[in-house]
């Protein structure tokens, strides 16, 4: 039973690694200019979320 569990965990970890590598490759493929725009968009969303949470708490 323990062997099967370890095998399942190993598959999960390897799948995560592949997914992470795809994300890194995509980020490099997009290029610095679009990457900066995406970064600003993500940052804006985070800031907006923080503001909304702050207003809700008040």
UniProtKB/Swiss-Prot annotation:
The residues listed in the UniProt record as binding Zn(2+), with positions renumbered to this chain, are: 12, 16, 19-20
Q: Which gene encodes it?
A: APP
Q: Where in the cell is it found?
A: Cell membrane; Membrane; Perikaryon; Cell projection, Growth cone
Question: What keywords sit in the KW lines?
Answer: Amyloid, Cell membrane, Cell projection, Coated pit, Copper, Cytoplasm, Cytoplasmic vesicle, Endosome, Membrane, Metal-binding, Nucleus, Secreted, Transmembrane, Transmembrane helix, Zinc
Membrane topology according to the record: Single-pass type I membrane protein
* Family, similarity comment: Belongs to the APP family.
Which GO terms are recorded in the biological process aspect for this UniProt protein?
cognition
Q: Which residues lie on this side of the membrane: Extracellular?
A: 1-34
- Single GO MF descriptor: metal ion binding
Gene Ontology CC annotations of this record: cell surface; clathrin-coated pit; early endosome; extracellular region; Golgi-associated vesicle; growth cone; nucleus; perikaryon
User: Main site of residence?
Assistant: membrane
What is this protein called in UniProt? Amyloid-beta precursor protein
Matching InterPro entries, A to Z?
A: Amyloid_glyco, Amyloid_glyco_Abeta, Amyloid_glyco_Abeta_sf
List the residue(s) that the UniProt entry marks as the site Cleavage: 13-14
The residues that the entry says bind Cu(2+) are 12, 16, 19-20
The protein's role, per its UniProt record: Functions as a cell surface receptor and performs physiological functions on the surface of neurons relevant to neurite growth, neuronal adhesion and axonogenesis. Interaction between APP molecules on neighboring cells promotes synaptogenesis. Involved in cell mobility and transcription regulation through protein-protein interactions. Can promote transcription activation through binding to APBB1-KAT5 and inhibit Notch signaling through interaction with Numb. Couples to apoptosis-inducing pathways such as those mediated by G(o) and JIP. Inhibits G(o)-alpha ATPase activity.
Q: How does it assemble?
A: Binds, via its C-terminus, to the PID domain of several cytoplasmic proteins, including APBB family members, the APBA family, MAPK8IP1, SHC1 and NUMB and DAB1. Binding to DAB1 inhibits its serine phosphorylation. Interacts (via NPXY motif) with DAB2 (via PID domain); the interaction is impaired by tyrosine phosphorylation of the NPXY motif. Also interacts with GPCR-like protein BPP, APPBP1, IB1, KNS2 (via its TPR domains), APPBP2 (via BaSS) and DDB1. In vitro, it binds MAPT via the MT-binding domains. Associates with microtubules in the presence of ATP and in a kinesin-dependent manner.
Q: Which Pfam families match?
A: Beta-APP
Taxonomy of the source species: Eukaryota, Metazoa, Chordata, Craniata, Vertebrata
PTM description? Proteolytically processed under normal cellular conditions. Cleavage either by alpha-secretase, beta-secretase or theta-secretase leads to generation and extracellular release of soluble APP peptides, S-APP-alpha and S-APP-beta, and the retention of corresponding membrane-anchored C-terminal fragments, C80, C83 and C99. Subsequent processing of C80 and C83 by gamma-secretase yields P3 peptides. This is the major secretory pathway and is non-amyloidogenic.
TM regions (residue ranges): 35-58
């Amino acid at each position: 039973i323990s062997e099967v569990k370890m095998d399942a965990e190993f598959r999960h970890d390897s799948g995560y690694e592949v997914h992470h590598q795809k994300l890194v490759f995509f980020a490099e493929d997009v290029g610095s200019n679009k990457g900066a725009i995406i970064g600003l968009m993500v940052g804006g969303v985070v800031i907006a979320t923080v503001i909304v949470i702050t207003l809700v708490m008040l």
